[in-house]
Amino acid sequence: MSFPYFISPEQAMRERSELARKGIARAKSVVALAYAGGVLFVAENPSRSLQKISELYDRVGFAAAGKFNEFDNLRRGGIQFADTRGYAYDRRDVTGRQLANVYAQTLGTIFTEQAKPYEVELCVAEVAHYGETKRPELYRITYDGSIADEPHFVVMGGTTEPIANALKESYAENASLTDALRIAVAALRAGSADTSGGDQPTLGVASLEVAVLDANRPRRAFRRITGSALQALLVDQESPQSDGESSG
């Protein structure tokens, strides 16, 4: 007589966690950090069409690491939620904490109820409304729905430990955009060097996706930095030239 295969709930959760962590670790890294003018997002991403960084609403941005189809589905759902709430109530009623909580609830439900967890890690960031002086808010949401409020920076995907260690050593509050980008790129290079046996790779315009939430912009704070505008900020980095321009 054969008995049905049994797995304890604890073992099932451990296996789900391991699956999700391995999937996220295979992804290229993403960094989000607060700087003097708002929040800077920097991702290792050679693709120009499969973007890891996005606007969610007027003062709220999104970044993710992991499986693209899964986090893009979450991104679109967040935009729809924000648009609906902003239309039904008031645009100022849409906050980063609110969207982070929605993502945490969604990922927690998927982790416990679906056959396979999402292999994603998310960051939701918000800057103050134009003319206000509130500090930027950074939220990290993990594959199981855990949520954390990070005061300075978030690191996701790839080998996070060397990147986080580099940021702990070099991060400076109220840094300029140029300095913040230099700090973020140097940290990403430290993570890439750890996985490539110590060689410091070149991260330039062609291999980076960069955007900011600019607290000094009225209404919509999100702005991508591409092409020659990014190249100008990377003058100290060895990077290839690109013909694109900064977009609004």
From Swiss-Prot:
Its biological purpose: Component of the proteasome core, a large protease complex with broad specificity involved in protein degradation. The M.tuberculosis proteasome is able to cleave oligopeptides not only after hydrophobic but also after basic, acidic and small neutral residues. In complex with the ATPase Mpa, degrades protein targets conjugated to a prokaryotic ubiquitin-like protein (Pup). Among the identified substrates of the M.tuberculosis proteasome are the pupylated FabD, PanB and Mpa proteins.
Self-association and partners: The 20S proteasome core is composed of 14 alpha and 14 beta subunits that assemble into four stacked heptameric rings, resulting in a barrel-shaped structure. The two inner rings, each composed of seven catalytic beta subunits, are sandwiched by two outer rings, each composed of seven alpha subunits. The catalytic chamber with the active sites is on the inside of the barrel. Has a gated structure, the ends of the cylinder being occluded by the N-termini of the alpha-subunits. Is capped by the proteasome-associated ATPase, ARC (Mpa).
Family under the similarity heading: Belongs to the peptidase T1A family.
Other information: Was identified as a high-confidence drug target.
Pathway(s) this gene product operates in, as recorded in its UniProt entry: Protein degradation; proteasomal Pup-dependent pathway
Coiled coil stretches, renumbered: none
InterPro entries: Ntn_hydrolases_N, Proteasome_alpha, Proteasome_alpha-type, Proteasome_asu_bac, Proteasome_sua/b
Biotech relevance: In the course of search for new antibiotics, a class of oxathiazol-2-one compounds has been identified that selectively inhibits the M.tuberculosis proteasome over the human proteasome and that kills non-replicating M.tuberculosis.
Keyword Acetylation among UniProt keywords: yes
GO terms under cellular component: cytoplasm; peptidoglycan-based cell wall; plasma membrane; proteasome core complex, alpha-subunit complex
Deletion phenotype: Cells lacking the core proteasome prcBA subunits exhibit reduced growth and persistence in mice. They are also attenuated in interferon-gamma-deficient mice. They also display increased sensitivity to reactive nitrogen intermediates (RNI) and increased resistance to oxidative stress.
SUPFAM superfamilies: N-terminal nucleophile aminohydrolases (Ntn hydrolases) (SSF56235)
Name of the gene encoding the protein in the UniProt record: prcA
Positions of modified residues (Phosphothreonine): T84, T178, T202
A Gene Ontology biological process term: modification-dependent protein catabolic process
Keywords: Acetylation, Cytoplasm, Phosphoprotein, Proteasome, Virulence
Keyword Protease attached: no
GO molecular function list: threonine-type endopeptidase activity
Post-translational modification: Phosphorylated by the PknB kinase at three threonine residues (Thr-84, Thr-202, and Thr-178) in a sequential manner. Phosphorylation enhances proteolytic activity of the proteasome.
Name of this protein: Proteasome subunit alpha
